[in-house]
Amino acid sequence: MQKTNKFLKIGTKEFKSRLLVGTGKYSSLEVMQKSLINTKCEIVTVAVRRVQGLEHGHKGLMESIDWKRIWMLPNTAGCSNAEEAIRIAKLGRELAKLAGQENNNFVKLEVIPDKKYLLPDPIGTLKAAEQLVKEGFTVLPYINSDPLIAKQLEEIGCATVMPLGSPIGSAQGIRNAANIAMIIAESRIPIIIDAGIGVPSEAAQALEMGADGVLINSAIALAENPILMAQAFSKATEAGRDGYLSGRLKENPLASPSSPLEGVISNN
């Protein structure tokens, strides 16, 4: 965990913003573009399969983002096993090259056989991550909030781990804060909370806990005003990080007056 680092460092890259943003579910490319600007993000994740298949909402996506300013994070969304994820990761690397990022080996690794709750497969994720690390990828795996899996992925060479706050798109917030706190405490790599965050205050909570960043998509894209919500998440992420660095007031079972009692005028 990068406790007091000024920048978010993933692999050999450093980023000022700790807010990563997804590109799906926006009502239009124009709304997405304006939202991305308001987030001040420097990393944007792109679903390789959907972009290549030109699915609804993804046609023209690659051309609508300034890849000289934004670092692409290809993801393996839609992959249900390790082999499929490895293949899509390689396509993602080529996609980044087409965008002019020749040295981009980043991949957001998702192995999700469960179509109902979209929970990641830990065994498939470990298998794919191990192979991708060997092939020179900077691997950012999406995982359940399991400290043991997180540590195993760190030990095989992943650049971060990305535990879910709650299921993808559920807007349930950070449901397993205790486990995530364990992951943060035991990790020597950055921790990015991914999935389930629904409002800016939950992003602030994640950073206050000591997470190094958050990845947000649905909460911005599906808001009534995505462009304004993007700005709110940007501010919340910065506030949460500042709050963490400031050192919070310790909880106390007793009250503590904010004004000193010495010198108080008595009734006598």
Curated annotation (Swiss-Prot):
Catalytic activity of the protein: [ThiS sulfur-carrier protein]-C-terminal-Gly-aminoethanethioate + 2-iminoacetate + 1-deoxy-D-xylulose 5-phosphate = [ThiS sulfur-carrier protein]-C-terminal Gly-Gly + 2-[(2R,5Z)-2-carboxy-4-methylthiazol-5(2H)-ylidene]ethyl phosphate + 2 H2O + H(+)
In the Enzyme Commission scheme, what number(s) does this protein have? 2.8.1.10
The domain of life is Bacteria
For whether the record's keyword set contains Lyase, the answer is: no
Name its cellular compartments.
Answer: Cytoplasm
Q: What is its main location?
A: cytoplasm
Region entry Disordered: which residue ranges? 248-268
Q: Which keywords describe this protein according to UniProt? A: Cytoplasm, Schiff base, Thiamine biosynthesis, Transferase
Q: What GO terms fall under cellular component here?
A: cytoplasm
Binding sites annotated in the UniProt record for 1-deoxy-D-xylulose 5-phosphate: 169, 195-196, 217-218
Q: Identify the metabolic or biological route this protein is part of.
A: Cofactor biosynthesis; thiamine diphosphate biosynthesis
Q: Name one GO molecular function term.
A: thiazole synthase activity
Tell me the active site.
108 (schiff-base intermediate with dxp)
| InterPro entries in the cross-refs | Aldolase_TIM (IPR013785), Thiazole_synthase_ThiG (IPR033983), ThiG (IPR008867)
The answer to whether keyword RNA-binding applies is no
User: Where along the chain is composition biased (Polar residues)?
Assistant: 255-268
Extract one GO BP annotation from the record: thiamine diphosphate biosynthetic process
Enzymatic class: transferase
Cite the record's note on assembly.
Answer: Homotetramer. Forms heterodimers with either ThiH or ThiS.
Write down the PANTHER family for this protein, in alphabetical order: THIAZOLE SYNTHASE
Q: What does this protein do?
A: Catalyzes the rearrangement of 1-deoxy-D-xylulose 5-phosphate (DXP) to produce the thiazole phosphate moiety of thiamine. Sulfur is provided by the thiocarboxylate moiety of the carrier protein ThiS. In vitro, sulfur can be provided by H(2)S.
Similarity-based family: Belongs to the ThiG family.
- What is the protein name for this chain? Thiazole synthase
